[in-house]
Design a protein with these regions (language model features):
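Carbohydrate-recognition beta-sandwich/jelly-roll modules
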Residues: 51-329, 334-335, 350-353, 359, ...
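Active-site groove signature of glycoside hydrolases
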Residues: 331-333, 442-472
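Active-site-adjacent "subsite" loops/lids of carbohydrate-active enzymes
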Residues: 373-448, 536
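C-terminal segment of N-terminal export signals and the immediately downstream linker at the start
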Residues: 21-50
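Active-site-proximal substrate-binding groove within the catalytic cores of carbohydrate-active enzymes
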Residues: 243, 253-259, 264, 436, ...
Length: 602
């Protein structure tokens, strides 16, 4: 078994440039959007209970919370074509199992519209099952239309407040940070009726709707780790997009949700225009100029990667004859005396691994032994310190982690006894990264092999696994903030470490230097239509100045499917990556592996 089939949560059309990516170079600090020279101030006006918004870049009309018109001011392009003000629900409360409760006028409700100031209005909803407020503001500086939805009810169990945009023009393409970047028609089956949680699936808080010469985009400027989600379509209507503001778990007694502001604006050109504006905000919000300066210069030399590399020294010899070792990143999973994914967080190197790592270091290779960030074996003695702080589902409270039996995931035992006595089934429980004692134990246990093996880089698994959970706040931190702190803690062990991790999003990118990334809903086996998921390197644009990505699994080049997977990673901006079992696959490469080596060599 090379890797568990754990990440199956939420598809090559355009050829990637035949250039090995480096850390993304800096781009202009000026936003190349619409000019606001000699324009009127932004305004929000209420007339006959309809809200009219004007900024230097857009004009919009909102009726009962529904955007019935959204136009780019420079071109006059309209992005809403069939808004439904009769049956559609703009504001909703979300409960467990995707149950929605409408906040609107049906069942004897009413809607009020209030002019608050020259640039602000409120739409207040009083419905049978709850009340809500939609605050509408025009930002004079950015030209953004700002929407802040909130809703409350007497019924406990609220997970999120959803605000929907309906009637999107059918020719638009969605560009969004799902699996490193997608650019798909709104009615593409790959994204039909899916809720993408941030940041595990929705890897940054923005979405762009691209037309032939421009588009509009929606984003939130949130640096407080608040959970959110985007809903792409409904079962019956692919041209609806929902934006969720989540409440932290536990939600059993929760009666309300909201607090996030969604910013809407138009742009001319392609999606990289708003993506760059978001990157600039992101850099400032998290002080990433300082993080960028911490990156080691040798990272830019990396142009080739091997994922799940066996520990055969002959592989190093074969590689050295094909490419300079200083250009090669090696992800090394089976280096401990324990079996893979057993007995974490114990990290004791085997004698054969010591030989492999030492030889590789002497030759100049960059070898990343595989550790784990939050998964631990409950049969390990450390469990007694942290057993009260596991991940539990925000909806059903089940323990989260994994067990593996007969080549399939079977979940975590809820029996306290069975949880402790099934190491052979690779039982692992996720521990909240906000827990200081966990970070301390993990760091201490990692530092021993770091010193013994003279490591300067490590790989920590499942860093992408950060989402809203039942016990969401530990030491006042959600898992997102806790993971950020954990990655930084690992990077500061000993003399300092370069950190690689699994997946890439706007939280983990801040201190990771390498990211092993998944293809679209295809961590192991490729889904039907995966070839349509390429051609968009959005996350490379957002995070490429901080992180280099490399491929995940099934990258042998032995058949058409693995060739496609290798190409898709290139299109997302990853360095050429292969997965092999034997040294001969490097010494006598097939056509696809040979191509990856040629690309890596420039």
């Amino acid at each position: 078994m090379k890797r568990r089939n754990f990440i199956k949560t939420a598809g090559i059309s355009a050829a990637a440039a035949l250039v090995t990516p480096g850390l993304e170079p800096g781009t202009s600090d000026s936003y190349s959007g619409n000019s606001k020279d000699q324009i009127s101030p932004a305004s929000v006006k209420v007339k006959d209970n309809i809200v009219y918004i004007e900024t230097f870049s857009l004009s919009a009309v909102i009726d009962k919370g529904i955007v019935i018109s959204l136009k780019d001011k420079a071109s006059g392009e309209e992005f809403i074509e069939k808004p439904d003000t009769t049956n559609f629900r703009a504001l909703q409360l979300l409960y467990r199992n995707n149950e929605l409760s409408n906040i609107n006028e049906e069942k004897f409700g009413n809607t009020e519209v209030h002019q608050i100031s020259e640039r602000r209005a409120e739409i207040v909803f009083h419905s049978w099952d709850g009340d809500g407020v939609l605050t509408i503001t025009a930002d004079d500086q950015t030209g953004d239309l700002m929407i802040e939805p909130s809703a409350s009810t007497s019924r406990p169990g609220v997970l999120a407040c959803r605000w929907n945009i309906t009637g999107l023009r059918q020719s638009l393409e969605l560009v969004a940070p799902f699996f490193q970047g997608i650019k798909l028609k709104l009615n593409d089956p790959l994204i039909k009726n899916i809720r993408w949680g941030w940041p595990f699936q929705w890897e940054a808080g923005l979405a762009m709707f691209q037309s032939e010469k421009g588009g509009f985009w929606v984003h939130t400027q949130d640096n407080k780790y608040r959970f959110k989600a985007i809903q792409t379509g409904t079962q019956d209507d692919p041209f609806t997009i929902g934006f969720d503001s989540e409440a932290y778990g536990p939600i059993d007694d929760n009666l309300s949700a909201g607090g996030l502001c969604w910013r809407i604006n138009t742009y001319r050109g392609d999606w990289k225009v708003p993506a760059e504006r978001y990157r600039q905000w992101y850099w400032q919000a998290y002080n990433l100029d300082a993080e960028e300066k911490l990156r080691q210069k040798w990272i830019n030399d990396i142009s080739f990667a091997i994922s799940w590399c066996p520990g055969d020294p002959a592989i190093l010899d074969a590689l050295s004859k094909k490419i300079s070792p200083k250009k090669v990143l090696i992800h090394f999973p089976n280096w401990r005396t324990d079996n893979y994914d057993e007995n974490y967080p114990t990290f004791i190197p085997s004698e054969s691994a010591k030989t492999f790592i030492k030889k590789g270091q002497q030759m100049g290779f960059h070898i990343m032994p595989h550790f784990n960030s939050i998964d631990m074996d409950p049969s390990n003695p450390v469990y007694s310190y942290v057993r009260d702080f596991p991940y539990r589902s925000v909806e059903n409270k089940q323990l989260q982690g994994w067990s593996w039996y007969n080549r399939r995931v079977i979940g975590v035992p809820e029996s306290n006894t069975n949880r402790l006595n099934n190491q052979d089934k690779k039982v692992m429980v996720k521990i909240h990264p906000g827990l200081s004692i966990w970070r301390s134990i993990l760091g201490q246990n990692m530092l021993k092999p770091v010193n013994e093996l003279s490591l300067d880089l490590v790989f920590i698994d499942v860093t992408l696994c950060i989402w809203n959970i039942h016990n969401c706040l530990v030491e006042s931190m959600p898992p997102t903030e806790g993971m950020n702190k954990l990655i930084k803690h690992v990077s500061e062990l000993g003399p300092g470490l370069v950190v690689g991790g699994e997946g890439l999003n706007e939280i983990t990118a801040q201190r990771q230097s390498f990211a092993q990334v998944h293809l679209f809903r295809s961590s192991q086996d490729s889904i039907e239509g995966i070839e349509r998921s390429g051609g968009c390197n959005l996350n490379q644009v957002l995070f490429g100045r901080l992180v280099k990505t490399f491929g995940y699994s099934n990258l042998s080049g032995r058949n058409k499917d693995t060739e496609t997977r290798m190409q898709l990673h290139l299109e997302h901006g990853a360095v050429p990556t292969v997965t092999i079992s034997l040294a001969d696959e490097i010494a006598n490469p097939n056509a696809s592996v040979k191509r990856m080596l040629e690309l890596a060599n420039g």
